[in-house]
Amino acid sequence: MKKKYRIKKNDDFQKVFRRGKSFANRQFVVYTLKQEGSTHFRIGLSVSKKIGNAVCRNRIKRYIRQSFHELESQINPENEYIIIARKPAANMDFHEVKKSLIHVLKVGRVLKQKPNNSK
């Protein structure tokens, strides 16, 4: 995922926190805010030091970014997303992270339904 599609600035994070909607499961909290006219979604990641050391935190962030990259065609391009990882995410492999993100995005109704004949 290109860096221009990431949320980095504190003001951008605060805007999504204040105006956006949130939904969660045991592993992740997702905040979403609709941005009219945007051609591509942006994501911001937050993984607390409580979750583990730098290696563990960076692994979780890589897994989340890769999951969004693979789900790119199903995700609404007019939204900004902030994903906050919770403690149970520390012990998950990539496939579990992706499955959990799919679940929480479906709960928030921001994931388009995948056609039955494609993988």
UniProtKB/Swiss-Prot annotation:
GO terms for cellular component: ribonuclease P complex. Keywords: Endonuclease, Hydrolase, Nuclease, RNA-binding, tRNA processing. Its EC number is 3.1.26.5. It catalyses: Endonucleolytic cleavage of RNA, removing 5'-extranucleotides from tRNA precursor. Belongs to the RnpA family. RNaseP catalyzes the removal of the 5'-leader sequence from pre-tRNA to produce the mature 5'-terminus. It can also cleave other RNA substrates such as 4.5S RNA. The protein component plays an auxiliary but essential role in vivo by binding to the 5'-leader sequence and broadening the substrate specificity of the ribozyme. HAMAP family: RNase_P. Consists of a catalytic RNA component (M1 or rnpB) and a protein subunit. NCBIfam families: rnpA. This is Ribonuclease P protein component. The gene is rnpA.
